[in-house]
């Protein structure tokens, strides 16, 4: 435990210094917008809205269903991010989720050389996006159904992919069950891009997001849609849980 607490201290010092130059909330200095980890039980830590369970290898935080129909580019964003094209929204700051994942030992992609990829998703950015790497993670959502019974599902089961072919009619298929990639975002021009853009998790390749989609079709911004047959009602509260897969 002493070694782990030392890691926490070092990570917090690093994160506080790294994020000190990112834009602060209006009328607040940057130092006040970053929460220090607090141990609430043996091996369990909270960073603001984010909870880290070291033994379970999980990071959890509150979110809510944001869309029940339509085209998606993101799985999860903040309310200040591109919420008009995201399945979930969460008030948890991406920088605090990132610190929580660092506490679990997650590793993302290398810092990209081209800062131009920090922009929003479009055909040009997709064409020049690097091949993304990172640790594999599983993402689940916990919510209560109409009867008040707790349910747990893999988040990809609330997503479908539309496959368009010149040779036959378009086909809609469920998103494949499987891991996501913790790519970890990056810094550019003294900004942590996931925090600046409010981008937790992208369905369409976006290096600025903390999490990316490794499935076929992730390089196309017209293929991913809400699975309106299975997604809970809009604004349904969920607990978003990220589990780091064994390496």
Residue spans for each PLM region:
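Bacterial N-terminal signal peptides
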Residues: 6-17
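Boundary at the C-terminal end of the N-terminal hydrophobic targeting segment
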Residues: 18-20, 24
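Long, low-hydrophobicity ectodomains and other hydrophilic envelope-associated domains
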Residues: 27-247
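N-terminal secretory signal peptides that target proteins for export/translocation
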Residues: 1-5
């Amino acid at each position: 435990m002493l070694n782990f607490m030392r890691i926490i201290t070092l990570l917090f010092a690093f994160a506080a210094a790294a994020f000190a130059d990112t834009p602060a909330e209006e009328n607040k200095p940057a130092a006040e917008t970053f929460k220090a980890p607090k141990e609430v039980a043996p091996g369990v830590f909270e960073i603001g809205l984010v909870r880290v369970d070291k033994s379970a290898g999980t990071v959890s935080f509150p979110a809510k269903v944001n869309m029940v129909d339509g085209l998606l580019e993101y799985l999860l964003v903040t309310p200040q991010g591109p919420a008009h094209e995201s399945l979930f929204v969460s008030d948890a700051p991406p920088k605090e989720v990132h610190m929580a994942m660092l506490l679990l030992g997650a590793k993302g992609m290398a810092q990209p050389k081209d800062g131009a990829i920090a922009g929003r998703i479009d055909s040009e950015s997709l064409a020049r996006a690097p091949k993304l790497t990172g640790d594999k993670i599983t993402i689940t959502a916990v919510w209560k159904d109409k009867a008040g019974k707790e349910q747990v599902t893999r988040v990809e089961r609330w997503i479908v992919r539309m496959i368009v072919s010149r040779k036959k009619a378009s086909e809609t298929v469920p998103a494949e069950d499987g891991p996501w990639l913790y790519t970890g975002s990056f810094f550019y021009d003294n900004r942590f891009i996931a925090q600046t853009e409010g981008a937790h998790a992208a369905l369409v390749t976006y290096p600025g997001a903390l999490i990316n989609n490794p499935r076929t079709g992730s390089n196309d911004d017209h293929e991913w849609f809400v699975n309106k047959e299975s997604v809970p009602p809009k604004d349904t509260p969920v607990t978003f849980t990220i589990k780091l897969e064994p390496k």
